[in-house]
Amino acid sequence: MKSFFNIIRLTIKIICTFLYKQYLRLFFKRIGKNSTIYPFIDFYQPDQIVINTDCIIRKGVIIKGRSLNKIGVFIGKGVSIREFSNIDSYMGYVHIDDYSAIGHNCIIGGHGGVKIGKYTMIGGQTYIISSNHKFDDLDIPYMLQGECTKEIIIGNNVWIGANCTILPGVTIGDNCIIAAGSVVTKSFPNNFMIAGNPAKIKKTINFSYIWSKETV
């Protein structure tokens, strides 16, 4: 009897999941095959959101596709986004390339544009914000002076630790590692380990040395 009820419960779950995904497809620009989208997720302007195949979007995630472009948020193949992260194109765009992973409670603001490369890991509670408030005139409150925007580019195979902040205009090269808690205020080329507030280069990642050492 217990196994019978388990089968019924599993069947209902499969049917509900299928119907939920079909319902979402009515509104989204595109949702790829084999993508898992958990319930209790908030979407805004879903007709400007693309989710490719084999993605996992966990509960509590907020994705806002509002943009002046046709696509505000592009999520590549095999991307995972952990619980309670907030991704907002904010009239710009957020592009997350294939097989990258966004940790829990991250905030990505795409007002000035955010590009994240392939196989990149972003630790929990990281802020990636491509805009900032102006502060040119002391006679006008900062909140009324508008914003300035600069694109953020994060390369392929980058590992960003938890609790980092990436500021507008920053480019992080391929294969970089950003230590937890770092505040990245300027750009860095490929193959560096970076840490601190403000973040500075700590060492070069020498892949030829690593491979030769492992071979021995």
For the regions a language model picked out, list residue spans one by one.
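Short hydrophobic beta-strand element within catalytic cores of glycosyltransferases
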Residues: 184-185
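Flexible, glycine/small-residue-enriched loop-and-beta-strand segment within the central core
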Residues: 44-51, 56-166, 205-206, 210
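Conserved catalytic Walker-motif region of ABC-type ATPase nucleotide-binding domains
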Residues: 37
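Terminal amphipathic alpha-helical/low-complexity segments used for targeting or macromolecular assembly
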Residues: 1-34, 119, 125-126, 131-145, ...
